Structure formats: C-alpha cells, structure tokens
Design a protein with these regions (language model features):
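A short tyrosine-centered beta-strand micro-motif
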Residues: 74, 143, 147, 267-275
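Cytoplasmic C-terminal tails of single-pass
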Residues: 337-363
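Short, solvent-exposed loop/turn segments enriched in Ser/Thr/Gly
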Residues: 46, 57-63, 126-128, 140-146, ...
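Short acidic, flexible loop segments centered on an aromatic residue
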Residues: 76-87, 92-101, 149-150, 216-232
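Short beta-strand elements of extracellular/lumenal beta-sandwich folds
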Residues: 52-72, 132, 201-214
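Intrinsically disordered, low-complexity Pro/Gly/Ser/Thr-rich segments with frequent PxxP/GP/PP motifs
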Residues: 98-138, 231-264
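Membrane-proximal extracellular "stem/stalk" segments
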Residues: 184-315
Length: 363
C-alpha cells in the first residue's frame, strides 16, 4: 500500500447537473486502484507517471496495474486525451476538449491504442496494456496528456440513483499523466493573443481574451496582467491580474476579465495585456468591439446585474393613478352636473310656485 500512496495520480470528480441533492464522495468509495508500470525508457525513474523518451516510428506497449480488492467484478473504461488548459490557467489531463487546438499536430488519442473497457475480477488484479505508435516524423518538444480510468456505471447503479431520487452523482476517476518526447532540443515558449470577445462565466459577464501556447512545451509560472479601456481613452474600466498559472503544450484558454457586476455596454474598446513566464515577456494592445445585440443578450442573463425593470412597475402604478384620477374627475363632473340640473329644477319649481301664489292673491 505504501507503493500506491506514492503515486502522483490525479483524482478528477466528474459532476453532472444538480437539482435535488449533492452527495459527498471520497476516494475510499473507488472500487479499484491503479499503479503505472514504469518502463526502462522512462526519462526520470523517480516519477510515478509515464514520462517516456522514444524514437520516431517506434512502437511500445506500456502497462497499468489495476487492482480490485472488492468482492465484485469491476468494469473499468480507459480513455486517452491530450492535455489542455482550463479557464483558471490549470493543466487538465483527464478532460475532453471541446475543440482540438489548431497547433496540436499529434493528438495522443490517435497515437495511443487501448481497449474500450476491461474487467477486473473480484479480489484480483489485471494489467492494462496501452500501445504507443509514435509519428513517423521526428518532432521537437513533448506530447502531453492523460490516461483516464473510470469505473463503468451499470444499469443497477442507475436504477438505485433513480429510486433514491438523486439527480447528481460524484463520479471519480484516476488520471495517469503521459508525456512523450524524442529529443532534448530546446524549445522556446511562444504565446499568441487570439480572439477578444464578451461572454459569461457562471452567469456573470466577462470579456474573454484567448491565449494560445503554440509550442510543444509547457508554459510554467505564467502571470497575466490585463486592463480594458474605451478606445482612445485612458480610464481603466476593467482589469485582472493572475499569477502561478500553467499552460499545456499546444493549447489555448479563454482568460476571463470580470466586469464585477457592471453592465456590458456596446462600443469600441482596447485591451492591453502583459504575460510573463520565467523571464520571457509578451505584450499586446488590441482593439475590439462589443455590439449592442451581444451586450443586451448577456446583460439579461447576468445574475449580478440589478433588475432595472422596476420602472415598468412604476409606470404601471402611475398609469393606474392617472386612470383613477380621470375616472374620479368624470364622476365628479357628472355629479356636479346632476346637482346643477337639480338646483335649476328646484329654482324653476320655486318660480312657478311663486307665480301661482301671486295669481291667487290677485283674484
């Protein structure tokens, strides 16, 4: 067991949509354990993940020992992915990218072959083989990714979740890092700034600046300082600073600049950004535009923006008061008219009565 505890293996919690109940699951609930079998061509034998030096066109089979200490068979589904960089500037080895980076020539999923699933019998262990077929052309730098090992969800598990009324489950997986290289040629990291666009993170307005690592090498200890102004002006509207980030080889991520609850306003803006990594500095100054349609759409769904629809209720209230006043005025006018007519009738009646009295006296 001591050997297993020394493994540098990433535990990844895969969460589905939550509606009713969030359950807490820890590593002890996993029904299997893993141990990479480190081969002779490991660049550093002290590392407990795969960090292999190979040659172009070479083929090699590596193995991971899967141990099942439970009294039931366990079905494990392996998956291989190239490393990517998430929105927080952290390298992910077990996540599936929405879209492969344009500079990534060799995807690990195309280079490494593994079975779709493997059965590990109860109280036993199985060695899972993975075959690596290196590209024919030699490349500088590294290929980096991860081998995700997750237990297959059975129909019984699904039924139990349904009976318990759960809409969420914490599904954990082991992710073993895999790094491949062919030579020791020095690679100088290079970053590029791509699209700048308004978007949202967790239902909050941000302006995303897409940063891309176009080299086959990690960018370590990355710090970013960004500020946004109106085009042609100096007043800083939004700003963001981050340190200690890392980018995977040939990957990109959207660096979010928060608006801190402010409304997006249509117009022309300027982004000024500086990135630093181990003594190397990049600086960009780019103009971009936010159109009215995008601003309105995002403002409606930003949970931090105060609802300014109160004026509608105020308008309705004022309208009702005006209607009430108009109705009161009409009714008052009618009443006054009736009173005036009644007064005139009464005066006319008095006059007639008075005339009759005069005639009677004359007689």
């Amino acid at each position: 067991m001591k050997k297993y505890t020394k493994l540098i293996i990433f535990m990844v919690a895969l969460l589905t949509t939550s509606t009713f109940l969030i359950t807490k699951v820890n590593a002890s609930e996993l029904n299997f354990s893993v141990e990479p079998i480190i081969p002779a061509n490991q660049r550093d034998q002290k590392k407990t993940y795969f960090d292999l030096k190979m040659e172009a066109s070479a083929s090699q089979t590596i193995e991971i020992n899967l141990r099942n200490d439970t009294k039931n068979d366990v079905i494990i589904q392996p998956r291989v992915n190239s490393a990517l960089t998430n929105i927080k500037g952290v390298v992910e080895y077990g996540e599936l990218p929405e879209k492969q980076d344009s500079t990534l020539i060799h995807n690990l999923n195309d280079i490494v072959t593994v079975v779709d699933e493997v059965i590990v019998p109860a109280e036993s262990h199985v060695r899972l083989p993975l075959t690596i077929d290196m590209p024919k052309e030699e490349f500088d730098g590294i290929l980096a990714g991860g081998i995700t090992l997750q237990e297959k969800q059975t129909d019984t598990d699904t039924n139990k979740k349904g009976e318990q009324g759960l809409s969420i489950q914490n599904r954990y997986a082991y992710v073993v890092a895999l790094v491949l290289n062919e030579n020791d040629n020095e690679i100088v990291p290079e970053l590029e700034l791509n699209e700048i666009a308004a978007a949202q993170v967790n239902a909050r307005n941000v302006i995303n600046a897409n940063l891309q690592n176009i080299t086959a090498m990690y960018v370590n200890q990355l710090s970013v300082n960004a500020k946004i102004t109106r085009q042609g002006q100096n007043e800083v509207l939004y700003k963001s600073t981050s340190e200690g980030m890392q980018m995977a080889p040939n990957s990109n991520f959207n660096y979010p600049i928060s608006l801190d609850g402010a409304k997006l306003e249509a117009g022309k803006y300027t982004l000024e950004m500086t990135a630093e990594s181990k003594g190397k500095t990049w600086h960009w100054k780019e103009n971009f535009t936010i159109d009215g349609e995008t601003a309105n759409k995002l403002n409606k769904t930003d949970v931090t923006i105060e609802n300014n629809s109160n004026w509608i209720y105020i308008l309705i209230g004022v309208s009702l008061i005006l209607v009430a006043l108009i109705l009161w005025f009409i009714l008052w006018k009618r009443k006054k008219k009736k009173e005036e007519e009644a007064r005139k009738k009464e005066l006319a009646a008095r006059k007639r009565k008075k005339k009759k009295s005069v005639k009677t006296e004359k007689k």
